[in-house]
């Protein structure tokens, strides 16, 4: 078992008020047969705490483990969201690499052609050489500007994706995320819960 998951399970166990001794003292023969049957979906739903009432990380931890055990299909939606995010970030990274390589190729080509343009045998006027230098500088500025615009666009798209993910967490009734202000920084408990979800989804 992953060490992070093991640590979280240990934390979950320590935060529970039910002990193994209490469980052993229960007289199983006193449980009616009708209650020993497999619980229905309705009963399972009601056995999980109301997410809106959860305000602390230990309570959220218990809720997530119960949700993962009883209704894993809900966390499956988060797994798809995580996969989509990773795929989008990978595409952005590849696109930026292609953009940088394109600019570097143009720069190398200019460096190759520059000795030819400065060859005295070609007898080019000095104003032509100055124009070439100015063109090179302008091209470099254009390339840097294009790269900066790409980075700014990625930042905007990342912020939009972040807000959409917060909305999905709220829609799935994930504790601590039911009423989140997009402009506020996440609390430490929210960050810990996100890390827990990442560990579970990556397991």
UniProtKB/Swiss-Prot annotation:
Keywords recorded for this protein, A-Z: Cytoplasm, Nucleus
Biased amino acid composition, Polar residues: 124-138
Localisation per UniProt entry: Cytoplasm; Nucleus
Domain of life: Eukaryota
Pfam family, one: DUF2458
Principal location: cytoplasm
InterPro entries: DUF2458
GO cellular component, one term: cytosol
Spans annotated as Disordered: 117-138
Disulfide bonds: none
Entry protein name: Uncharacterized protein C557.02c
Organism: Schizosaccharomyces pombe (strain 972 / ATCC 24843)
């Amino acid at each position: 078992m992953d060490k992070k998951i093991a640590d979280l399970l240990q934390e979950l166990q320590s935060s529970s008020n039910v002990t193994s001794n209490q469980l052993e003292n229960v007289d199983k023969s006193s449980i009616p047969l009708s209650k020993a049957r497999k619980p229905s979906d309705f009963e399972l739903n009601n056995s999980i705490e109301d997410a809106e009432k959860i305000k602390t990380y230990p309570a959220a931890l218990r809720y997530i483990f119960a949700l993962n055990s009883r209704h894993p299909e809900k966390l499956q939606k988060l797994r798809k969201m995580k996969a989509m995010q990773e795929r989008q970030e990978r595409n952005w990274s590849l696109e930026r690499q292609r953009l940088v390589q394109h600019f570097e190729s143009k720069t190398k080509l200019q460096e190759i052609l520059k000795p030819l343009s400065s060859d005295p045998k070609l007898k080019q006027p000095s104003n032509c050489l100055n124009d070439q230098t100015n063109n090179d500088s302008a091209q470099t500025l254009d390339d840097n500007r294009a790269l900066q615009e790409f980075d700014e666009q990625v930042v905007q798209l990342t912020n939009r994706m972040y807000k959409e993910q917060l909305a999905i967490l709220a829609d799935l009734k994930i504790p601590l995320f039911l009423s989140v202000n997009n402009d506020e920084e996440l609390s430490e408990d929210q960050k810990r819960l996100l890390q827990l979800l990442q560990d579970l989804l990556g397991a």
